[in-house]
Amino acid sequence: LQISLENTPFLENTDIENAHKMAELYLIIFCFENSARHFILKIFSSNFGEDWWNIIKNTDFKKKVEERMSREQKLKWICQRGTSPLFYLDWSDLLKIIRKYENLFTPFIADLKFIELRFEELERVRNIIAHNGIIPDKNDINRLILYFQDWCKQLKELSI
């Protein structure tokens, strides 16, 4: 994508520099979050088959997914966020699902605290990135990188 950002009204050069830094972090959180969603989807598909959503959904999840899908149906000029209901749930909802079905996930991640710690700590950072904020704290940046690397190492060679 080639576009000149230097002439963006009301933004200083430091704002543009921050945007470039945040774009790099977005790549990491995008890969982390989508990897997590696909991992959960694989676990449920392999254990419950095609009907997995009807088995795992609760009233809150069902309502949230239906509202978000309905909104997308009305705004046809905007693409869908995903083909699976998991892509319509919040980051924190993913952790709730994993906790509820812990027995399905522990064969792949021996200690659920591995996921809990990373998901809980990264939720704030993820929200800043997702809402076009700036993360100036190098520790938060390093934590995101480290947690993503941990996630990849833990799940890299799994076959589900």
Residue ranges and their predicted role:
Residues 1-160:
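Amphipathic alpha-helical interface elements
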